[in-house]
């Protein structure tokens, strides 16, 4: 059995937590995030920590409590420090630019690709082949990064495409004659 749920989530100074039944909202310097907690989980706020326990009558209570703890910990980190995700564009003529809340991509198609960013997410391009996404919500940042990568996934022969900065693309050998 995993023991993730047994560890409390420490609430740092400057973070405000509101528990209202199964709804929780966490507010910090980077914004406010809210989430509905699973019915199998009971969350208690004591001192500067959130504790988790399963409710009676649920088979997967500890599993849901561990998941809830991980999600709320990510919310606390998001509103205090925030999350970043870096993408790289590999390929001749592949470029990225940010205009307002729209990421413009040139990925070898006959048309440029414009991707609108959701609220709470900002993007910047330190160079034409790099995109840095920043925001408080870890799930939304990962989703936006996956959507940008899906326009041109790294191909296995030359490795061209949009990849995560820490991604290792395994390349295949070309066909022998």
From Swiss-Prot:
Molecular-function annotations in GO: rRNA binding; structural constituent of ribosome
Pfam families registered for this protein in UniProt: Ribosomal_L6 (PF00347)
InterPro entries per the UniProt record, alphabetical: Ribosomal_uL6-like (IPR000702), Ribosomal_uL6-like_a/b-dom_sf (IPR036789), Ribosomal_uL6_a/b-dom (IPR020040), Ribosomal_uL6_bac-type (IPR019906), Ribosomal_uL6_CS (IPR002358)
Gene3D superfamilies recorded: Ribosomal protein L6, alpha-beta domain
Keywords: Ribonucleoprotein, Ribosomal protein, RNA-binding, rRNA-binding
PROSITE patterns to which the protein is assigned, alphabetical: RIBOSOMAL_L6_1
Gene Ontology biological process terms from the UniProt entry: cytoplasmic translation
GO cellular component: cytosolic large ribosomal subunit
Subunit structure, as described in the record: Part of the 50S ribosomal subunit.
Cross-referenced NCBIfam families: L6_bact (TIGR03654)
PANTHER family referenced in this protein's UniProt entry, alphabetically: 60S/50S RIBOSOMAL PROTEIN L6/L9, LARGE RIBOSOMAL SUBUNIT PROTEIN UL6M
Function: This protein binds to the 23S rRNA, and is important in its secondary structure. It is located near the subunit interface in the base of the L7/L12 stalk, and near the tRNA binding site of the peptidyltransferase center.
UniProt record similarity statement: Belongs to the universal ribosomal protein uL6 family.
Name used for this protein in its record: Large ribosomal subunit protein uL6
Organism the protein comes from: Pectobacterium carotovorum subsp. carotovorum (strain PC1)
Taxon lineage: Bacteria, Pseudomonadati, Pseudomonadota, Gammaproteobacteria, Enterobacterales
Gene: rplF
């Amino acid at each position: 059995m995993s023991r993730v749920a047994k560890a409390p989530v420490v609430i740092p100074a400057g973070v405000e937590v509101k528990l209202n039944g199964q709804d929780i909202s966490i507010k910090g310097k980077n914004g406010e995030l809210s989430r509905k907690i699973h019915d199998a989980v009971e969350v208690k706020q004591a001192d500067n920590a959130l504790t988790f326990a399963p409710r009676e009558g649920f088979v997967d209570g500890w599993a849901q409590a561990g998941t809830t703890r991980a999600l709320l910990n990510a919310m606390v980190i998001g509103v205090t420090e925030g999350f970043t995700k870096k993408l790289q564009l590999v390929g001749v003529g592949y470029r990225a630019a940010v205009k307002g809340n729209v990421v413009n991509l040139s990925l070898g198609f006959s048309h440029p690709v414009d991707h609108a960013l959701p609220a709470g997410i900002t993007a910047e391009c330190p160079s034409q082949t790099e995109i840095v996404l920043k925001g408080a919500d870890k799930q939304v940042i990962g989703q936006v990064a996956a959507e940008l990568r899906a326009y041109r996934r790294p191909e296995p022969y030359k490795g061209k495409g949009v990849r995560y900065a820490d991604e290792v693309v395994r390349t295949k050998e070309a066909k022998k004659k």
